């Protein structure tokens, strides 16, 4: 189970861990680079090439006697909706996977609040000083913006430095042609009123060449918004109803 940008591993119990145990699965979660213990104790920042993280995780799992290497599933929540398909392009030992929600471009949630001229500045390295100056004025007049940039920037390894450099780093977190290499069956959630990456679940679904399914969640059933926080029972039921037959069949070699 792969967490997102800022949650503790304990939260993964709510986002599928307990439901997995109830169905007889074993469940494992971890802190990857930029996440909780890996960030605070080891000072390891995020990395966009998440296959470098998940491949060692799978190696550790298959070394255990209580793990069937042909029936390993992966659930990724929040920003892991980007990391999961990125890793699946290179790591093919999962029998099935879930992205909740699908994320094609992490940076859109950072870029959309900016005025157009500042987004244009980010496309031109010669405008770095101008961009940083604009952000400096924003941070001076808004303590909340300054605090948010520091909090959100720290996992990327560039907090407290140049805002231009921070945004450039976040803009690396975009899926490209590598998604054409994804062959693992993937379930993609699409919650109504997604706050951070609206429309990207459908976009990811349309990009993938292999078996995939888009599952929508609505406000009417109490399962709207990012990661369906008020409708976790509904979410878990659909996720594991989809995973069960894939894991019974096992990974196709």
Enumerate the language-model features and the residues they cover.
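The serine-hydrolase catalytic nucleophile loop
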Residues: 5-18, 200
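Conserved alpha/beta-hydrolase "acid-adjacent" motif
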Residues: 194-200
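Catalytic histidine neighborhood in serine/cysteine hydrolases
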Residues: 205-224
């Amino acid at each position: 189970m792969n967490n997102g940008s800022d949650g503790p591993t304990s939260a993964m119990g709510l986002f599928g861990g307990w439901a997995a145990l109830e169905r007889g699965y074993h469940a494992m979660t971890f802190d990857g680079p930029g996440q909780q213990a890996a960030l605070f104790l080891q000072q390891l920042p995020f990395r966009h090439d998440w296959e470098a993280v998940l491949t060692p995780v799978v190696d550790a799992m298959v070394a255990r006697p209580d793990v069937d290497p042909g029936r390993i599933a992966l659930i990724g929540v929040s920003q892991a909706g980007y990391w999961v398909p990125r890793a699946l392009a290179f790591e093919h030992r999962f029998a099935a996977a879930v992205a909740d929600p699908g994320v094609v471009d992490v940076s859109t949630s950072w870029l959309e609040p900016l005025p157009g001229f500042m987004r244009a500045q980010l496309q031109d390295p010669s405008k770095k000083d101008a961009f940083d100056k604009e952000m400096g004025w924003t941070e001076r007049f808004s303590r909340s913006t300054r605090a948010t940039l520091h909090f959100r920037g720290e996992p990327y390894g560039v907090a407290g430095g140049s805002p231009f450099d921070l945004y450039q780093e976040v803009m690396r977190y975009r899926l490209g042609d590598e998604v054409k290499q994804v062959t693992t069956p993937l379930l993609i959630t699409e919650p109504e009123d997604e706050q951070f990456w609206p429309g990207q679940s459908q976009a990811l679904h349309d990009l993938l060449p292999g078996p995939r399914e888009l599952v929508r969640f609505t406000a009417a059933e109490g399962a709207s918004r990012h990661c369906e926080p008020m409708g976790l029972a509904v979410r878990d039921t659909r996720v594991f109803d989809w995973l069960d037959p894939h894991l019974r069949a096992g990974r196709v070699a």
